[in-house]
Amino acid sequence: MVVWIRGDRLHAETLQWARRHVEELERFGVTPKLAVLLLNDDPVELETQRRYVSLKAKDVRSIGGEVEIYELYKEPPERREAAALRLIERLNNADDVTGVLIQKPLPPYIDEGRLFERLSPIKDVDGLTPENKKRLVAGFDLDRDILPCTPAGILELFRQYQVEVRGRDVVVVGKGTLVGFPLSIMLMQMDATVTTLHALSKDRAYYTRKADIVISAVGRPPELYGDNPWRLTGDMIKEGAVVVGVGGKVDPATKRWYFDVDENSVAEKASYLTPNIGGVGLATRARLVKNLIITTYMVLTRVTSPRLLSL
């Protein structure tokens, strides 16, 4: 019988931890404040990102923090990147802003690298600036570093549910800079044997059927994408595999969610499985709150490394 890897306990414990730190920060006259940049005007991406951001904002406000959302997708495409760069510079210098989230994925005509190079690493709540990426590659600390939220959330769930990755064959479907790529690096550092699949990988099911752990982070459900769609089904895994579903998109017409993993068929064969609702999403949100607390202390103390903090 499948064990469901749920994120509710991790989420609740993290928010409780964060509230204690917000009270401590109040003694110094500091309130965590998250600035969110929305840049993608693709209908599916925009509807999905709005859902995600509303939940993230709810969490931050629930711990006593503040959130400001900048709807840069309303800018004309030819001016959007320049507007984002100007805003990032302003947020870097804003004393009341302690964390900045550039919501991904970005539209293809925006240079992602330029945005994250401009962003201050001490306000980078997604761990995607060059400085934070270097720290991840050099050897990450799950408890102390500013890490990409979804990969870190997944590893925290594995720790909570005692899912061992050392020495196991892990397939990560998707190589995006937000989830697949950093997660593959982190798993290799934990001595897993990692295969990372992407849009040009041939016969992806060949690899997923052999894996001890399958992590699906694509976000191209067949209901919404005719070009290179993806869904992991029960016939694409081996008996007893651990399966983690990350990708999900909202149909802007029906407001319905569609996910990477066919939950019902996969549950018949998997030993551990994250539910599409209440699994990785909650863990991701928990990590964002944790990262915001870390960046708030970094802004307060002006330290350049989170490992210099005692939290």
Curated annotation (Swiss-Prot):
One of its GO terms (molecular function) is methenyltetrahydrofolate cyclohydrolase activity. Disulfide bonds: none annotated. Homodimer. It catalyses: (6R)-5,10-methylene-5,6,7,8-tetrahydrofolate + NADP(+) = (6R)-5,10-methenyltetrahydrofolate + NADPH; (6R)-5,10-methenyltetrahydrofolate + H2O = (6R)-10-formyltetrahydrofolate + H(+). Keywords: Amino-acid biosynthesis, Histidine biosynthesis, Hydrolase, Methionine biosynthesis, Multifunctional enzyme, NADP, One-carbon metabolism, Oxidoreductase, Purine biosynthesis. It comes from Pyrobaculum neutrophilum (strain DSM 2338 / JCM 9278 / NBRC 100436 / V24Sta) (Thermoproteus neutrophilus). GO terms for cellular component: cytosol. One of its GO terms (biological process) is L-histidine biosynthetic process. PANTHER family: C-1-TETRAHYDROFOLATE SYNTHASE, CYTOPLASMIC, C-1-TETRAHYDROFOLATE SYNTHASE, CYTOPLASMIC-RELATED. This is Bifunctional protein FolD. The gene is folD. Belongs to the tetrahydrofolate dehydrogenase/cyclohydrolase family.
